Amino acid sequence: MEESLKPMDAEQLRENAHKMVDFIADYYKSIESFPVLSQVKPGYLRDLLPDSAPDHPESLEDVLEDIRQKIVPGVTHWQSPNYFAYYPSNSSVAGFLGEMISAGFNIVGFNWIASPAATELEVIVLDWLAKMLNLPNQFLSSGQGGGVIQGTASEANLVVLLAARDKFLNRFGKRSLEKLVVYASDQTHAAMKKACQIAGIYPENFRVLNADHTSNYALVPEALSDAISNDLSAGLIPFFLCATVGTTSSAAVDPLSELGKISKVNDMWFHVDAAYAGSACICPEYRHYIDGIEEAASFNMNAHKWFLTNFDCSLLWIKDRSALIQSLSTYPEYLKNKASQENSVVDFKDWQIPLGRRFRSLKLWMVLRLYGLENLQSYIRNHIKLAGQFEQLVCSDSRFEVVVPRTFSLVCFRLLPPPNHQDNGYKLNHSLLDAVNSSGKIFVSHTVLSGKYVIRFAVGAPLTEEEHIKQAWKVFQDQATILLAGSDGSDFGASNGDII
């Protein structure tokens, strides 16, 4: 007769966890040996795994070997020091240890009573971060506001939009939904458009305002004022503005002070999305980029991007938590308890879309305690310095140009097209990106700014050092030389750049 399954045996955990930590540590020691961008073809894994799950147990050694041989080749290595695509997704020893503890407890902290420590630690740690960022006191839990950990900035944007929507519907009536107008620039993350779709905002009432090179792709206050005036004249209700500190395409910074004043005059909900660049604002020399946050109703940043905290961990602060709670709260009988009914505790289920939630504050707490503010500031500054060095390398080669001035650790640049080039270098840079990524030596991503195909070089991986910056630049130079030598610049193909 088979032994009964003991899925959480302490000694088995001890033995296997040691093996798993060794496996992960070995992965990090050898991470530079892998192509940064996975080189597999779509559907590669289907032929490598059985058609059905096993009937009987297999050994951990066999599973780990399959990970080495079958899974790792299909991994794009976000933690590689040669990863420069999108924006970073940081990991660290502290963050990893926090994830381990969270997985060990495996609580589902939807309300206070479900695990008091999970709720209370989150409140405390978000207050710590608010003070590190020098946010106004209204964002602290001691007043009417407070902070909460969401999964992603997309969730943060959605919940504050829902809170704002319901606040205005309560004021103007449920039938006024068709009149509510949302404002953002064309550089705002696409998550805002999705949030509007989910919130039922009429598509024609999502104002996407043009931001171009004349403002370094920041939202122009005059454009916002004009759009609001036109909508008011048409009998519509301007109610929500999303500004960005560190846009996805170019790390542009919207002018918060001026936008905040416009929002205040028009009694709008002003939200600031600093998913990427918010982390830099713990450094005094970068704090001015969120000057004007005083007028914001809500603010978010992703600790999992550039703050050494493993994914997922998006931080959201709000000045009036009652707006979130009124929009998102539910009180089924099976969740009622004395502490909640007496309003003596925070129930974070009412600050988010799902009911269940992980103990995410543990890893953030571990990062803050094991590294401290000074080390975190140095970490940010080093990446910005490395990006500055890469920018100088670009400027030193007359074949390239920096497309927008660098603000943080993102460099936007392109290879200049030969004279009389038909598409202004679009295909040329498309091909350069494809060649660089196909080499497996580095991974970068792209955007399009004012019709120009632009390569984004985002410094932020925890293991990246100066040598990796220099090596990456050599890859660009070598591939550019090959491209320019092989054609007159009039026709460049790109086999798979559209999906990179």
Curated annotation (Swiss-Prot):
Pfam families: Pyridoxal_deC. It catalyses: L-tyrosine + H(+) = tyramine + CO2. GO terms for biological process: alkaloid metabolic process; amino acid metabolic process; carboxylic acid metabolic process. Keywords: Alkaloid metabolism, Decarboxylase, Lyase, Pyridoxal phosphate, Repeat. PROSITE patterns: DDC_GAD_HDC_YDC. Mostly expressed in bulbs, and, to a lower extent, in stems, roots, leaves and flowers. InterPro entries: Aromatic_deC, PyrdxlP-dep_de-COase, PyrdxlP-dep_Trfase, PyrdxlP-dep_Trfase_major, PyrdxlP-dep_Trfase_small, Pyridoxal-P_BS. Belongs to the group II decarboxylase family. This is Tyrosine decarboxylase 2. The lineage of its organism: Eukaryota, Viridiplantae, Streptophyta, Embryophyta, Tracheophyta. The gene is TYDC2.
